[in-house]
Amino acid sequence: MIPPFHGQWESAERIGEILAGTLRAADDPLWPRSGAAGAADYERWADHLCGVACLRMALAAQGITPPRAFDLARELTHRGGYVLRPDGDIRGLIYAPAVAWLRDAHGIAAEVRVDVAAEAIPEMLAGGGLFIASVHPAIRRAGAEPPSQGGHLVLVFGVQGDLLRFHNPSGDSTETQMDARLPLAEFARFYAGRGIALR
């Protein structure tokens, strides 16, 4: 089963414009749907909500209606899943509080995984597992050479042959957002070896 898709920004079809700088996030016409306090709040936070989007997709995959993006972001911030730094920067998603929230709020078994080779991901998906994987955001561009690994989260939900199937909440087109597919070796170039495994 392919999980329902949720993007970091509410207007999934306009994420490409937001990333290209031709549309300000504050001008996303669907921002009120997010639960943000205002357009400026939405613009400040949405770029950091890849983890929230992945958690929402993981809940939806299990038939659970997910909370609005900013309702979940506020809950996770309260739990330490996001940290607001004195300089205004936002740090997160921090995995352990997210795992605790999945358990406490929904009874979902999840665990933080580190030092996990890309080759081990298919085994984690067996039997309906999901993996929120840390990758470089350049994963949306086929053939791109990432300057580093990590910094962004995607929801890996399936395997087809040697391809990993995943949703990318900051994909800039339908093809790079929903059920994106990459060979395992190609995925590994972007992958930081860590994430959250859900059963």
List the model feature ranges, each with a label.
Residues 7-39, 43, 47, 144-148, ...:
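Noncatalytic regulatory segments and standalone regulatory/sensor domains
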Residues 81-114:
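Mid-length scaffold segments of soluble, non-membrane domains
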Residues 113-167, 198:
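Active-site-adjacent substructure of cysteine-protease-like catalytic cores
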Residues 52-56, 96-99, 118, 122, ...:
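Extracytoplasmic/secreted envelope proteins and their assembly/folding machinery
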Residues 1-88:
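Active-site-adjacent structural segments surrounding the nucleophilic cysteine of cysteine proteases
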Residues 56, 137, 170:
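Residue-level signal for short, function-critical loop segments
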